[in-house]
A protein has these predicted regions:
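Residue in the alpha/beta-hydrolase core beta-strand immediately N-terminal to the catalytic nucleophile
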Residues: 41, 76, 99-102, 180
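Conserved acidic catalytic loop of the alpha/beta-hydrolase fold
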Residues: 58-75
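Flexible "cap/lid" loop of the alpha/beta hydrolase fold
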Residues: 85-129
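Conserved alpha/beta-hydrolase catalytic His-Asp/Glu region
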Residues: 118-183
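Conserved HGGG/HGGXW glycine-rich cap/lid loop of the alpha/beta-hydrolase fold
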Residues: 2-49
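Short beta-strand/loop motif that positions the catalytic acidic residue
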Residues: 182, 188-190
Length: 192
């Protein structure tokens, strides 16, 4: 992707076990509105190489390095679920690099049920089914009504991606303190 420095840049950060696919329509819309859009896959996710990053802080540092690589000086970060934790951490640690923050369906702390972590670490598809049930129950607005099979495709991905992400969320303890340090405009979007 070529970045046009005169345009503002939006970074779209997916949630646990997911990839840039979840932002496809948003990416098209924001691009058509004149924004640079970085719809990323975290390491180990989607089309990205390397192992999954094991902590929210590691992901924040990776985002900073990505910005340096693509020569972007400031971003508006839109984070979903785990991406909210990354957004909170990033905005508190790198205030000069963030213009705006949008948090979608997340919180400053995300304790994860140990049974769910255990299922993911075992590569059990039930971990995915439970997440989709809790997060999207009743929704048919996804790929063929079934987001699970199109986003995460194997038990290896459940073990090596989803389990790592769930542990990163569960182990992030600096959320409240980080939230208090944020000084950029922030929009929180939550449902019931």
């Amino acid at each position: 992707m070529e970045i046009e420095n005169k345009k503002p840049t939006i970074l779209l950060m997916h949630g646990s076990g997911l990839s840039h696919i979840v932002w496809s329509l948003h990416e098209q819309f924001y691009t058509s509105q004149g924004f640079n859009v970085l719809s990323i896959d975290l390491p180990g996710h989607g089309n990205s190489d390397g192992p999954s990053l094991k902590s929210i802080e590691d992901i924040s540092n990776w985002v900073k390095k990505l910005m340096e690589k693509v020569k972007v000086s400031k971003i508006s970060l839109v984070g979903h679920s785990q991406g909210c934790l990354v957004g909170i951490d990033f905005a508190s640690r790198y205030p000069d690099l963030i213009d705006k923050l949008v948090l979608v369906a997340g919180s400053y702390k995300m304790p994860v049920n140990q049974d769910l972590i255990d299922l993911a670490e075992a590569g059990d598809e039930k971990a995915l089914l439970l997440m989709m049930k809790w997060g999207y129950e009743g929704s048919k607005a996804f790929i063929g009504g079934n987001p699970v099979k199109k986003i995460i495709n194997s038990t290896r991905e459940i073990r090596e991606i989803l389990a790592v992400d769930l542990n990163a969320c569960n182990n992030y303890k600096d959320g409240k303190e980080s939230l208090e340090k944020i000084n950029c405009p922030t929009l929180c979007i939550f449902g019931d």
